[in-house]
A protein has these predicted regions:
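Carbohydrate transferase catalytic cores enriched for Leloir-type hexosyltransferases
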Residues: 1-406
Length: 406
């Protein structure tokens, strides 16, 4: 039996465009439900205890929020459904007892050892939850680590987040029977913490998949000017400031001939200078378009008509938007950082995140009709094989079976 923790998904009701971690937890839940394997669903409840979710409630909630994010149902009706199912799930968690979960996680004499699986960082800093779980049942604890960015780059994190994330990593290195990571970059960042803990649990490197819906038929580009897209929460490490300053200059120099910049993502924290530019800079009003929420179907249509995806981030653990863009055949201009190099390989173009002139030259080149430079990347894309969720889960299923059999 696999008990998958859905705490993060339950916290995302009404939050708009899903983050990469949201997508991962959804993908795991959908895979587990579709597989028909023995499964349970759990979430953290008040008092730092884990409680069982009724299986039908969990399955209905997962289906509803998946349809919402993909844009495959009426938005207003779907939002009401997600909120109603979310309330039902939270009531069940609030009323549930940890004893019921623990009884599920006690192995039968001839069955494989059950697994408690946490694929977000949600409540991983609460060491006592996992200490109690390990003390009271024989279940294997497997968790997925997405990145160590708050520890490596505390200047880009909220105050206190570096210490909080360090507690998460310490919990994982102390209590996890096995670990899953999304990239070799994340594995290498995690290794010193494992060395310090003096434990060597098995670590699986399993890149995430990108299975976007097919592009809509017969729809042309949503804008009549060349445009570029940046898909990201607006926060300091994502380096929106580089693009906004560049676009302000392009607007002043080119006027209506300037390409458009479309920003897709929620506004984050400590980005006053970026928000001020978005809200108050006259030069950006006609050239920068902000979309806080966008379902997958609309995202595919937007990406399909773009000149390139832009990713000027200072730090990443994986880079979901990059594989999604490349999967659609859209060129990408990226920061020259290890995680994006690992994902983009020899296909994307890479620049120092502070190289304003380099970014500017590439953007103007890619914006031009018949750009040879853009065509060269499109040609390289022909030999690129996108990672698939099916491959990810084939590796993860084998890994979990091996850990449960130990």
């Amino acid at each position: 039996l696999i008990a998958l923790d859905l705490s993060r998904l339950l916290s995302r009701v009404g939050r708009g465009t899903p983050t990469g971690i949201d997508r991962v937890e959804l993908a795991y839940a959908e895979h587990l439900i579709a597989s028909g394997s023995p499964a349970a669903f759990t979430a953290v409840a008040p008092g730092s205890r884990l409680a069982l979710l009724p299986h039908p409630t969990a399955a209905q909630y997962v289906a509803a929020i998946g349809d919402t994010w993909r844009g495959t149902a009426d938005p207003a009706g779907q939002d009401r459904l997600v909120r109603r199912l979310g309330r039902q799930a939270r009531i069940a968690i609030f009323a549930g007892r940890e004893r019921a979960l623990l009884s599920q996680l006690r192995p039968a004499p001839t069955a494989p050892v059950p697994v408690y699986l946490l694929v977000s960082h949600h409540h991983l800093e609460r060491r006592q939850i996992f200490a109690r779980l390990k003390a009271r049942c024989a279940a294997r604890f497997i968790c997925l680590i997405h990145d160590l960015i708050p520890i490596e780059f505390p200047e880009y994190a909220k105050p206190g987040q570096a210490a909080n994330h360090l507690r998460r990593i310490e919990t994982a290195t102390q209590f996890a029977d096995a670990l899953i990571v999304n990239s070799a970059v994340t594995r290498d960042a995690l290794q010193p913490h494992l060395d310090r803990a003096g434990r060597m649990p098995p670590v699986l490197v399993a890149p995430f998949g990108a299975d976007l819906p097919p592009p809509p038929l017969g729809e042309g580009p949503p804008f009549d000017r060349p445009y570029f897209v940046y898909v990201s929460t607006i926060e300091a490490r994502k380096n929106h400031l580089l693009l906004l300053n560049l676009w302000r200059r392009l607007a002043a120099e080119l006027g209506e001939r300037a390409p458009l910049l479309v920003l897709v993502g929620q506004r984050g924290w400590e980005t006053e200078n970026v928000i001020d530019l978005l809200d108050r800079c006259p030069a950006l009003r006609d050239t920068v378009i902000e979309r806080n929420s966008m379902p997958d179907a609309a995202m595919v249509a937007l990406l399909q008509g773009a000149r390139a995806l832009l990713l000027p981030s200072f730090a990443e653990g994986f880079g979901f938007p990059l594989i999604e863009a490349l999967q659609l055949g859209l060129p990408a201009l990226c920061s020259d950082i290890a995680a994006l190099r690992e994902t983009g390989g020899t296909v994307a173009e890479f620049f120092d995140p502070l190289d304003g002139p380099g970014w500017r030259a590439a953007i103007l080149d890619y914006a031009a009709a018949g750009s040879p430079r853009r065509a060269a990347q499109v040609s390289r894309l022909a030999g690129w094989k996108p990672p698939r969720w099916s491959e990810h889960f084939a590796a993860v299923d084998r890994f979990i079976a091996e850990v449960a059999a130990r």
